[in-house]
């Protein structure tokens, strides 16, 4: 599993890859939030660069959710994601975004990375498409006979099928016909404004309102108050 959460159901019966994992430099809030976030980003960068030095020939990619969903609706500064882009280029590694939850219009754009001013090399999708898969940017073509060029490499027992593809295409057509991505942006803007209003009304209860499109979140003081 690539999970980084403490839920034992994710790893009790399945292997957990022994990959290098680094500090999560999620956006911090409050008056010192920007300073704390930048400090966390610097620590994360040091850990990433150390991992590349230690395992130089064993690391193929940097993998991240552009917004950590199950991890606590953690957002990252676009500057940090652009830093990951630079490091991946310097180290000749791929930058992979897990957009299984953030993708397919939820954030008000088709893909969350479109908010960030950069493009990953590989994007994983699922959930709302009712089928899981990946698509790639042009950098993948640096690998001769990659999986997108050599059809037989993707025709595995657990691979996709025509029914999935037809159904997924119809979903995309409906999304375009009904402007569902634009609607997520408009309704999400209203939702975020109303959440900020609630936070102003109940400052001791609601804090750290954040969101892109309909992917909005807030913090409560404790599980009991929730």
Language-model segments: which ranges?
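Conserved N-terminal phosphate-binding loop of PLP-dependent enzymes in the Aspartate aminotransferase
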Residues: 1-226
């Amino acid at each position: 599993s690539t999970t980084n959460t403490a839920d034992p159901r994710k790893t009790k019966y399945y292997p957990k890859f022994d990959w290098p994992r680094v500090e999560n430099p999620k956006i911090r809030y409050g008056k010192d939030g920007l300073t704390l976030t930048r400090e966390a980003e610097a620590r994360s960068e040091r850990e990433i660069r150390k991992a590349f030095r230690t395992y130089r020939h064993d690391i193929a990619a940097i993998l991240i959710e552009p917004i950590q969903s199950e991890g606590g609706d953690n957002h990252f500064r676009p500057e940090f994601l652009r830093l990951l882009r630079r490091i991946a280029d310097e180290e000749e590694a791929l930058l992979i975004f897990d957009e299984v939850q953030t993708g397919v219009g939820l954030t008000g754009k088709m893909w969350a990375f479109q908010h960030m001013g950069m493009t990953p090399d590989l994007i994983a999708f699922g959930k709302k498409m009712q089928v899981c898969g990946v698509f790639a940017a042009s950098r993948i073509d640096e690998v001769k006979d990659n999986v997108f060029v050599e059809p037989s490499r993707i025709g595995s027992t657990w691979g996709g099928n025509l029914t999935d593809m037809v159904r997924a295409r119809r979903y995309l057509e409906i999304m375009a016909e009904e402007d569902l991505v634009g609607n997520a942006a408009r309704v999400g803007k209203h939702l975020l404004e109303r959440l900020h209003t609630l936070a102003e009304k109940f400052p001791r209860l609601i804090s750290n309102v954040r969101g892109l499109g309909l992917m909005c979140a807030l913090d409560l003081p404790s599980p009991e108050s929730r």
